[in-house]
Swiss-Prot record:
This is Small ribosomal subunit protein uS8. SUPFAM superfamilies: Ribosomal protein S8. PANTHER family: 40S RIBOSOMAL PROTEIN S15A. Keywords: Cytoplasm, Diamond-Blackfan anemia, Nucleus, Ribonucleoprotein, Ribosomal protein. It holds the Pfam family Ribosomal_S8. It is found in: Cytoplasm; Nucleus, Nucleolus. NCBIfam families: PRK04034.1. It is linked to Diamond-Blackfan anemia 20: A form of Diamond-Blackfan anemia, a congenital non-regenerative hypoplastic anemia that usually presents early in infancy. Diamond-Blackfan anemia is characterized by a moderate to severe macrocytic anemia, erythroblastopenia, and an increased risk of malignancy. 30 to 40% of Diamond-Blackfan anemia patients present with short stature and congenital anomalies, the most frequent being craniofacial (Pierre-Robin syndrome and cleft palate), thumb and urogenital anomalies. DBA20 inheritance is autosomal dominant. InterPro entries: Ribosomal_uS8, Ribosomal_uS8_CS, Ribosomal_uS8_sf. It comes from Homo sapiens (Human). The modification N6-succinyllysine is found at residue 88. GO terms for biological process: cytoplasmic translation; positive regulation of cell cycle; positive regulation of cell population proliferation; response to virus; ribosomal small subunit biogenesis; translation. Belongs to the universal ribosomal protein uS8 family.
Length: 130
């Protein structure tokens, strides 16, 4: 089976493991985008530590779950988001104003929408979590 969207598979498996109440989840294959997305989630405390296992193939990631995550998902296609349009996406994707994050890929790297607003940069929308 050919994987069309590696990030979507990773977030779906995290979502399913979280719903089942698991403590850990194994994600494969590993990619830079997944690692950066997980780093943003970890920075906000939605997941615990994660470990990258290099098996000289595509690699694996073991993610420790904390039980704080309600939902995470990918936005496909990756729409361009200007800074002024970010508010609309926030209203569409997130349940409330002070809750959850949208992850963007910008010229300054992969970051959440609040950091993008602070750095005054737009980009393409990758996904969300809350």
């Amino acid at each position: 089976m050919v994987r069309m969207n590696v990030l979507a598979d990773a977030l779906k498996s995290i979502n399913n493991a979280e719903k089942r109440g698991k403590r850990q989840v194994l994600i494969r294959p590993c990619s830079k985008v997944i690692v950066r997305f997980l780093t943003v989630m970890m920075k906000h405390g939605y997941i615990g530590e994660f470990e990258i296992i290099d098996d000289h193939r595509a690699g694996k990631i073991v993610v420790n779950l904390t039980g704080r995550l309600n939902k995470c998902g990918v936005i496909s296609p990756r729409f361009d988001v200007q800074l002024k349009d970010l508010e609309k996406w926030q209203n569409n994707l997130l349940p409330s104003r002070q809750f959850g994050f949208i992850v963007l890929t910008t010229s300054a790297g992969i970051m959440d929408h609040e950091e993008a607003r602070r750095k005054h940069t737009g980009g393409k929308i990758l996904g969300f979590f809350f």
